Each structure stands twice: as C-alpha cells, then as structure tokens.
C-alpha cells in the first residue's frame, strides 16, 4: 500500500504524490491547472509571495495498492476528469475556493 497525497493551491489541485521522500513518484497536473491557480491568485489579489505560498496545502493521505507510477498516473487522470474546464472556471471566479 502506498500513500497518495494531492497537493492543492486553495482548492485547485496541482500535483499527485505517491510514496514518501525522495523516492516518491510525483506527477504535475497539466498546464491548465497551473494557469487556473495563477488566475485565481491574481484575482484574489495576493499581497506577497508569502501570502501566495501560504495557500498551498497537502490533502490527507489515502492508501492505494499497486505500482507507484501507475497509481500516480491514474490519480492524475481522475483529477483531470473531475476538474474539467467549467469546474476550474468556477474555482478561478471564486478566488480558488470551492465554497
């Protein structure tokens, strides 16, 4: 069993991490997620780099069986489907927050 952690800026996912430490498998989500984060950060008028960095968080880990590379890829694909263009637009318009 491997720990899976999703990294978010506010409520917008950015990265999938499977495992721990230097040997962890990491997958950056596609550029559209990075662009959504940038737009939401600019829209929310972050005052400093520290304010921006303070909004990054790791979700609570969950366990999955299998090959770490496969797990990371599958989790990234799930996020790509769940966070379609429309959902990212809603998040951007709400300053990166789901509620």
What are these regions (language model features)?
Residues 16, 38, 84:
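Residue-level marker of positions within ordered structural domains that often coincide
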Residues 21-58:
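Acidic, aromatic-enriched beta-alpha/helix-loop junctions
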Residues 3, 7, 35-43, 72:
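Charged, low-complexity, helix-prone segments enriched in Lys/Glu/Asp/Gln
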Residues 48-99:
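Acidic, low-complexity intrinsically disordered segments
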Residues 4-5, 29, 48, 79:
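A general marker of short, structured functional hotspots
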Residues 1-27:
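Short, charged/polar N-terminal "headpieces" of proteins
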